[in-house]
Swiss-Prot record:
Protein name: Adenylate kinase
Keyword tags: ATP-binding, Cytoplasm, Kinase, Mitochondrion, Nucleotide-binding, Transferase
Gene: ADK1
Record-linked Pfam families: ADK, ADK_lid
Assembly mode: Monomer.
Task performed by this protein: Catalyzes the reversible transfer of the terminal phosphate group between ATP and AMP. Plays an important role in cellular energy homeostasis and in adenine nucleotide metabolism. Adenylate kinase activity is critical for regulation of the phosphate utilization and the AMP de novo biosynthesis pathways.
Domain description: Consists of three domains, a large central CORE domain and two small peripheral domains, NMPbind and LID, which undergo movements during catalysis. The LID domain closes over the site of phosphoryl transfer upon ATP binding. Assembling and dissambling the active center during each catalytic cycle provides an effective means to prevent ATP hydrolysis.
Record-linked PROSITE patterns: ADENYLATE_KINASE (PS00113)
Region (NMP): 37-66
Cellular localization per UniProt: Cytoplasm, Cytosol; Mitochondrion intermembrane space
Region entry LID, spans: 134-171
EC number: 2.7.4.3
GO cellular component: cytosol; mitochondrial intermembrane space
Amino acid sequence: MSQNSESIRMVLIGPPGAGKGTQAPNLVKQFGAAHLSTGDMLRSQVAKGTPLGVEAKKIMDQGGLVSDEIMVGMIKQELETNPACGKGFILDGFPRTIPQAEKLDQMLAERGTPLEKAVELKVDDELLVARITGRLVHPSSGRSYHKLFNPPKVEMTDDVTGEPLVQRSDDNAEALMKRLNSYHQQTEPIVEFYKKTGIWAGVDASQAPDNVWTSILKVLGKN
């Protein structure tokens, strides 16, 4: 996978377990663009103690939700200060509501860097439950396995260290169905928004990761 001279400006949409964490690095590698995960950005701004970070921390410490203005401000700051954004960006975890999508579009339009694509990774809930509830993690290294698709050599044991594997508490089926329900409620309007603006593209993410990658390149018109 070689970097090419094209740039890409896109939003990556998909439920937990759809493979965003697999495909985003592929996109970064292919285009040299920046992967902007809003969760990571928020943590980084708070850790650095930037004005936006200080403001966000105050709100989060009180159990509040960080405002759309702060989130869009963070993305704008990242676009202005992160050299990788010169080759474009892959936004992950944002926008989650129509007002966020509108504010994002407005800010990007003002910069002359509008979104080119909103790619939705589509997977049936049943398959996601099978994928996610089988996930096992080696806590200290972050190595992950899967009971069905990528089992460890010895049951519940890390291949490298022989230490026990754990199943994340939010990876049980009931908790997951709740997350999926709220994801659908939140995301369906966003998908409709991007369909209206004409930049939406859906990809069948139930395929093998390599095939998903090929499909993404196809909808981006880059294959």
